[in-house]
């Protein structure tokens, strides 16, 4: 089957689209990436998403309209990846669209029950591409008592499980998440959870203090030093004290968190602040490894993916943080995969599993009561 996976993440970089060929299903799936591209959001759409993400500034009219606008954006992104690959849209079998997360509440808060909302109307995508769309992957897991995240572990087992090595797959996107993939010889369970912020705080600080969208290659963070009192404040965040399975997002590490941090520590240089929040991402990862993974698993390799794997300052900090753990650290490209394409490929794989009516959540990662088939299916017009 030829499937396009569509992902728009918490970092709002743009729309990641991967054209993938998949043979079979389940752990025996054969997955080939044909082409990957990122289609940037225009400034108007990006600002509308940012407004929709803000509890203070959002409104139902905005979200209703944006749902259809993003559906059209996602459809155009599907057309673009096919065009770049010289692949006829008529040959496409399926689209797996994650959507744009507007709000994610994994745990009950007062009378607000666990819930999640991703937008990007699948009917618009199906109509514009004349292709069946599978979307809304998180909701069935949450209906089954899970947190709706992380969902990528299922695809990571298919792509990265090794005959003899125990691997950690560390994604550093807007949020960071880790998947523990025991070797094929092991009887230990796959586990996965969010470790905290990835690029989200770093990017927000860059935008506010340097008027830059992100810290390219970690060049600015390389110039500063870590401020202990800022790092201690960050590491005291309640999320780090929670036991897995757990997930987080912009609600905990977005604009509100950064506003409070910058107000509290405004006396410090902007370079030092950026260096310190970069170290916060690293320390939150290392903290979770040492508390929840390394006491129970012997890890041979850590494989980094996501935009953060291109931040050489962050990667070097992580190498230093794990230097005593006797594990090799790679980025996806070192073993023949694309860091950028990882999540888009994952949703192509999840769409394939739904098409075959196979469960594809990992209850040990999400906390769901059982394995479930994920996603809603939207057929194109006849």
Swiss-Prot record:
Transmembrane intervals: none
GO MF terms listed in the record are: ATP binding; kinase activity; phosphotransferase activity, alcohol group as acceptor
Carries keyword Nucleotide-binding?
yes
Classify the source by domain of life: Bacteria
* SUPFAM superfamilies reported for this sequence: Actin-like ATPase domain (SSF53067)
For ATP, which residues are the binding ones? 9-16
CDD domains of this UniProt entry? ASKHA_NBD_ANMK
Keywords attached to this entry:
ATP-binding, Carbohydrate metabolism, Kinase, Nucleotide-binding, Transferase
UniProt xrefs under Pfam families: AnmK
Cell cycle recorded as keyword: no
Catalytic reaction equation(s): 1,6-anhydro-N-acetyl-beta-muramate + ATP + H2O = N-acetyl-D-muramate 6-phosphate + ADP + H(+)
Pathway note: Amino-sugar metabolism; 1,6-anhydro-N-acetylmuramate degradation; Cell wall biogenesis; peptidoglycan recycling
Q: What is its EC number?
A: 2.7.1.170
Gene3D superfamilies found in the cross-reference section: 3.30.420.40
Q: Name one GO biological process term.
A: 1,6-anhydro-N-acetyl-beta-muramic acid catabolic process
According to its UniProt entry, the function of this protein is described as: Catalyzes the specific phosphorylation of 1,6-anhydro-N-acetylmuramic acid (anhMurNAc) with the simultaneous cleavage of the 1,6-anhydro ring, generating MurNAc-6-P. Is required for the utilization of anhMurNAc either imported from the medium or derived from its own cell wall murein, and thus plays a role in cell wall recycling.
What family is this protein classified in?
Belongs to the anhydro-N-acetylmuramic acid kinase family.
Which HAMAP family does its entry note? AnhMurNAc_kinase
What is the name of this protein? Anhydro-N-acetylmuramic acid kinase
Q: Which organism is it from?
A: Bacillus thuringiensis subsp. konkukian (strain 97-27)
């Amino acid at each position: 089957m030829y499937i396009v996976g569509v992902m728009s993440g918490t970092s709002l970089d743009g729309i990641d689209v991967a054209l993938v060929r998949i043979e079979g299903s389940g752990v025996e799936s054969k997955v080939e990436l044909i082409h990957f591209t990122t289609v940037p959001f225009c400034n108007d759409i990006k600002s509308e998403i940012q407004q929709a993400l803000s509890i203070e500034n959002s409104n139902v009219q905005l979200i209703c309209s944006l749902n259809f606008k993003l559906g059209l954006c996602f459809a155009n992104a599907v057309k673009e990846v096919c065009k770049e690959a010289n692949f006829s849209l008529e040959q496409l079998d399926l689209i797996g669209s994650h959507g744009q997360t507007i709000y994610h509440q994994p745990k009950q808060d007062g009378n607000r029950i666990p819930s999640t909302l991703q937008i990007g109307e699948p009917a618009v995508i199906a109509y514009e591409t004349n292709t069946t769309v599978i979307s809304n992957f998180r909701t069935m897991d949450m209906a089954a008592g899970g947190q709706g995240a992380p969902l990528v572990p299922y695809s990571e087992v298919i792509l990265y499980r090794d005959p003899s090595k125990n691997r950690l797959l560390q994604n550093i996107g807007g949020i960071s998440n880790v998947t523990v993939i025991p070797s094929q010889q092991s009887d230990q369970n796959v586990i996965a959870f969010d470790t905290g912020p990835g690029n989200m705080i770093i990017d927000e600080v860059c935008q506010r203090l340097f008027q830059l969208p992100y810290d390219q290659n970690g060049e600015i963070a390389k110039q500063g030093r870590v401020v202990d009192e800022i790092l201690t404040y960050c590491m005291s965040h309640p999320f780090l004290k929670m036991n897995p399975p757990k997930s987080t997002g912009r609600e905990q590490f977005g604009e509100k968190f950064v506003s409070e941090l910058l107000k509290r520590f405004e006396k410090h240089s902007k370079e030092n602040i950026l260096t310190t929040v970069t170290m916060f991402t690293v320390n939150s990862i290392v903290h979770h490894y040492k508390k929840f993974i390394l006491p129970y698993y012997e890890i041979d390799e850590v494989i980094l993916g996501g935009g953060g794997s291109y931040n050489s300052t962050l990667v070097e900090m992580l190498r230093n943080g794990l230097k005593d753990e006797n594990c090799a650290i790679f980025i996806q490209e070192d073993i023949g995969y694309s860091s950028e394409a990882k999540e888009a490929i994952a949703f192509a794989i999840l769409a394939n599993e739904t098409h075959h009516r196979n469960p594809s959540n990992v209850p040990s990662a999400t906390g769901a009561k059982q394995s479930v088939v994920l996603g809603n299916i939207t057929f194109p017009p006849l």
